[in-house]
């Protein structure tokens, strides 16, 4: 044993340059592997951050008609009625594994039906939200107050605006206490809200630009019980589901869509609830990143 070690040491010493180059190659190889793994991990974390808004862990589930997202403002030319969700389905979603919270909401995008005096709320969004929406989506009240249960029970015509909508509609005025018109109905602004993170998306496509444009124009929110006053009865709702971790977002979104599709014959009906495809968004981002190099 000792003799073998002595011979090995003599061999290394007699071929110092070759031994040095061999060790250098091994060191460079190990360092390269570490660098590649670190880069992949960093890219994966960036993709996760792009997809979820830096830690919100929420996934949207939207009603589709055929290959397109359903737009309640225009309906469908074939006259078929969209499916409606129930409170029981919401509770079933909340009870799914890895779900922390869930919310149903009505929505109109690029809304032109909201006014403050002579100012139109062009390009923003209006949501009819339930009591879970603000906490699920990470909103905090900046001024005034949020919705309380009596606002829902008594169908009070009150509204919340986010900070972007406050800037665009009120031009520096304090919006709390002001009256805005939504679908020809007066609503009193009771609070200003803002999402707790200051996430700025990494815009790479026109769809991402449109989404970001709506975000910077702002959002107006009213209690979901008041939605029929401003818009229509029996409009379909979409959902936001909060997972307990980023790794469970895809499975949670898929499971929630299955619950929401209960009662819909998805083989014959063109209506179907679909969750955001988190993995496909990740693959698209990777391709865009690679093509831009």
Predicted segments, located by residue:
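"Rare, low-scoring activations can occur
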Residues: 218-293
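Hydrophobic, regular-secondary-structure patches
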Residues: 41-125, 132-135, 150, 168, ...
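N-terminal Sec/SRP start-transfer signal
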Residues: 1-30
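Short helix-coil transition/hinge motifs at the ends and kinks of transmembrane helices
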Residues: 68-79, 198-214, 265-274, 278-292
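Hydrophobic secondary-structure segments that place a key small or acidic residue at a functional site
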Residues: 108, 119-235
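Alpha-helical transmembrane segments
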Residues: 29-40
């Amino acid at each position: 044993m000792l003799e073998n070690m002595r011979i090995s040491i003599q061999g290394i010493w007699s071929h110092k340059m070759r031994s040095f180059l061999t060790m250098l190659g091994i060191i460079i190889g190990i360092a390269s592997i570490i660098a590649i793994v670190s880069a992949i991990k960093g890219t994966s974390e960036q993709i996760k951050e792009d997809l979820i808004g830096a830690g919100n862990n929420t996934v949207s589930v939207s009603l589709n008609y055929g290959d397109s997202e359903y737009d309640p403002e225009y309906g469908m030319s074939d006259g078929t009625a969209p499916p409606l969700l129930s409170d029981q389905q919401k509770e079933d979603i909340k009870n799914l594994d890895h779900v922390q919270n869930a919310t149903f909401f009505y929505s109109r995008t690029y809304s032109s039906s909201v006014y403050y005096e002579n100012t139109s709320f062009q390009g923003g969004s209006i949501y009819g939200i339930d009591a879970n929406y603000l906490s699920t989506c990470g909103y905090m009240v900046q001024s005034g107050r949020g919705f309380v249960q009596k606002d829902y029970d008594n169908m009070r015509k009150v509204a919340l605006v986010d900070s972007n909508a406050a800037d665009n509609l009120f031009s520096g005025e304090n919006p709390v206490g002001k009256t805005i018109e939504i679908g020809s109905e007066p609503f009193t602004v009771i609070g200003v809200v803002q999402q707790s993170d200051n996430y700025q998306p990494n815009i790479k496509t026109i769809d991402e630009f449109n989404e970001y444009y709506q975000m910077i124009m702002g959002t107006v929110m009213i209690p979901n019980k008041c939605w029929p006053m401003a818009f229509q009865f029996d409009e379909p709702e979409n959902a936001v589901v909060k997972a307990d971790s980023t790794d469970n977002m895809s499975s949670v979104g898929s499971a929630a869509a299955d619950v929401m599709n209960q009662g819909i014959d998805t083989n014959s009906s063109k209506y179907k609830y679909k969750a955001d495809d988190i993995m496909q968004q990740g693959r698209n981002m990777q391709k865009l990143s690679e093509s831009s190099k």
